[in-house]
Amino acid sequence: PMLNISGEFKRDYKDVKKGTACILQRVIKLKKPIGQEESTLQAVVVVGGVQVGIPMEELDVLKLIPADKTSFWQIAQLSNDLISYYEKKGYQGGMRQEQAREADDYMKELEHAKLFYDDAAIEDYLQCMLLSIIPEKMAVLREGTPLVRVLKSPAPDMLMLGNDCLLVSTGMLTALDSEEELYAVMSREVAHYVLDHAIITVNKNIARAKRAQFWGAVADGVVAATEEYLYDRYDYYVPGLVFATNDVVQALVNDNIANRMGLDYSEKQEKEADHIVMNFMVLMKKNKDAMVSALSKINQYYQRNKDVEALSKYGAYGSLPERVGKLGKFTPLDEDRNYLKKTST
């Protein structure tokens, strides 16, 4: 796609002097001459009305300057070398379809267990916020616009699934105190989405049970959790009734499922998302302390509830304390009554 991102040269490059303004127009693929090792991917840059080709591995010669949310996320993709990654791995359309089917299966289980919190006003509020963050056009082809669903779960969680559904837990809405904190956490999920962290992670999670077998086991776990709960409480319980309990939530919101869908991001990916969002908050004229404030409140929830699994080395929030510390000093955001009213569940 056409990009048209403004920038300047950070150092002398061929006949172009350091500090020269330019426009990154697009990225193209060249035919590779026989015996030539130079990259076939080149950035087309316009300097003083003249086009200059820059191999993608030399793109760091440019300082790209975002003007809005779309150019910000496009720069994030280019700086992360995603285009070269796709050149080596391919776009993996088959795997993406498989991940979308995995996510569809997951949502069916959530629906069956009655774990969706249906509130049109809250969903509309969250959807509008997501649309204000996500780019209108990416530097690499991605289709569809993510849709928000609210999950009945006391734990603060937010997950972007492979079928472009953003799950936001009721626990996340109550753990945070302001719109800017929610904006920051949602921007982190958009960062994972834009940088394709889930597909990259799935490629690393090679050992995978067959889809039907995996989700069958998940469904069995939900039924077992439900029936154990009801047998303990009612003498005349008839097996087969689905009833939402904390055990059911744990059966459907856990690290095994996150791993299955490539959402067990590496510590490097988590820190990368943190860093990107801090810069994004500045560009969008938001309080960048909101990011650290939100992560700190999420961490407090898991520490308070002594959630050993979530805080373990391989858990979803295992690196949170260290990440919060590395993000530096911050001022926790106060309660925003308007936000609390909009997200009251």
Feature roles, as predicted:
Residues D119-L141:
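Zn2+-dependent metallopeptidase catalytic core
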Residues M172-L173, D177-E181, E189-R208, K286:
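Catalytic Zn2+-binding segment of zinc metalloproteases
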